């Protein structure tokens, strides 16, 4: 009985970097609501959760009224605003997840999409060129960097990613420098996607876990360039 209305039936989703407004039909009644999350997959996840809560006896309107209190989990399309730019930190570290978040960004972009991506060491090597290909296909510029290389040679990991890349990209092994470069490239209305670590606050190099946070790196850059 639940239908997410198509664009022909109604403007289904109005998206910007701050959230998604959408219309759905349930038991012959139409509802419009807003969630502070972006991405079509988050709309579907929300509707699934809403129906489960409704089955427990809660009215749809009562559930929708709580939407202002909903926030995406830390590191899941987590937004940091920088002037007209949206910087998203996301845990995407598989081909499917990378495709989902970049397709979501395409839906509301007004400028370019710049993507920072890497792959973990001592993990599935077959996904590396695939993720490189996806990042390049759905971004205007890609920065390939380290992401928990562990005991593998970081350059070997990057070389594996490079097998799938094309177009406008560059390699900056040091993730701190990669994020700073991505931030420096931003022009009006551009989006920066920083993928792979999400909620993690560490970088694993060799067998050592070193403190590192994508969010902190972005916030530090903003503080240092606030008067630029």
Question: Which functions belong to the PLM regions below?
Answer:
Residues 1-2, 36-38, 181:
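A structural connector/turn signal
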Residues 1-10, 14, 142:
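Single conserved hydrophobic/aromatic residue that forms the stacking wall/gate
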Residues 15-31:
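Acidic-glycine-rich active-site phosphate/pyrophosphate-binding loop
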Residues 20, 37-48, 71-76:
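Short glycine/threonine-rich catalytic loop with a Thr-x-Gly-x-Asp
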Residues 24, 35-37, 165:
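Hydrophobic residues in beta-strands and at strand termini
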Residues 27-28, 48-228:
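ATP-dependent carboxylate-amine ligase
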Residues 33-38, 85-89:
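Short pre-catalytic strand/loop immediately N-terminal to key active-site residues, enriched for Gly-Thr
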């Amino acid at each position: 009985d639940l239908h997410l209305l198509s664009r022909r039936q109604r403007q289904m989703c109005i998206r910007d970097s701050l959230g998604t407004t959408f219309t759905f039909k349930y038991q012959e009644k139409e509802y419009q609501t807003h969630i502070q999350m972006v991405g079509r997959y988050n709309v579907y996840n929300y509707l699934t959760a809403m129906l489960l809560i409704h089955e427990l006896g809660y009215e749809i309107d009562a559930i929708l009224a709580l939407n202002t209190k909903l926030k995406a989990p830390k590191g899941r399309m987590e937004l940091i605003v920088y002037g007209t730019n949206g910087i998203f930190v996301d845990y995407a570290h598989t081909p499917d997840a990378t495709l989902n978040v970049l397709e979501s960004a395409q839906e509301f972009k007004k400028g370019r999409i710049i993507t920072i991506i890497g792959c973990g060491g001592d993990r599935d090597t077959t996904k590396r060129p695939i993720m490189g290909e996806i990042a390049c296909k759905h971004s205007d510029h890609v920065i390939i960097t380290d992401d928990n290389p562990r005991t593998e040679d970081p350059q070997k990991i990057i070389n594996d990613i490079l097998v799938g890349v094309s177009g406008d990209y560059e390699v900056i092994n040091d993730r701190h420098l990669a994020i700073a470069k991505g931030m420096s490239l931003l022009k009006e209305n551009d989006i920066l996607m920083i993928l792979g670590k999400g909620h993690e606050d560490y970088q694993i190099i060799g067998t050592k876990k070193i403190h590192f946070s994508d969010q902190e790196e972005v916030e530090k850059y903003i503080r240092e360039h606030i008067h630029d």
